[in-house]
């Protein structure tokens, strides 16, 4: 792995096996996350971004299975370690904030029970020390009356408070990598801004890397250093955040940005991407985006493009850039 690389994903393939056959949810995904870097993975629902994060966490369960590729984290190959070794990593060096905090927290146990368990699992401390560390973490994420919240049940807290609890749990053991899967879903814009500000602050303090899974381009612009755009289980574009927003290369990325509401475009018709993401049964033979692409050619219909490098340093899976330097790996 390159110097400074914390997470390296190479040609990851995660399939789900159904009565009608194997469904490739993630198909040949490759990317890296460096120490202290925030990488955003964006795309429509069903593009494979959440399955990618679950694959990294070792949480893909039957009928799903990782059938190919390599995941390396901090020098270790995760695709070959045992579940017992994975449990030592999860919540410790490798943490995740899930989409919905209400369903991610156990309603039968107090916040203190659940937060304390994470600390006791990974640190050599007493129950009292774990309690004090838990209360300290709740205060750190901006929760008032932390002692009272520690004794509370999830249903007694608001959505924003529950999400802060999830962040406290994820960061309790100072992980090297935090995977945040739609961390601000279903939160109002004020709470969303507070959560994003909180994540930036805590990550800066601990030099934690973030893999941010989202469909919200506003969150991406605010948080990310690097952006990965996924479509139908593949990476279709990768670039630094400034390049991607200034000069999007792939027609799908261009469509995503064009369909984002703009407060300065009053009275203008909101653009959209025609069509829908293909299913396993309707997956095109060539480029997966060609049925929805305004620039599609005959080559796009019959040949699947590789990931190529543009003159601006972006990596893009599109025949419009054929002849440019091909992306390595």
Feature map (PLM): residue ranges:
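Conserved ABC ATPase "signature" region
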Residues: 76-77, 128-148, 257
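A short, proline-enriched helix->beta-strand linker immediately N-terminal to the Walker B motif
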Residues: 172-176
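Conserved ABC transporter NBD signature motif
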Residues: 66-77
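Short catalytic/signature loops enriched in Gly
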Residues: 4-5, 144, 238-329
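A short, flexible loop at the N-terminus of ABC-type nucleotide-binding domains that lies
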Residues: 2-6, 15-28, 59-65, 81-85, ...
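P-loop NTP-binding/switch modules centered on Walker-like glycine-rich loops
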Residues: 58, 179-183, 187-268
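ABC ATPase NBD coupling module
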Residues: 78-95, 121, 243-248, 278-284
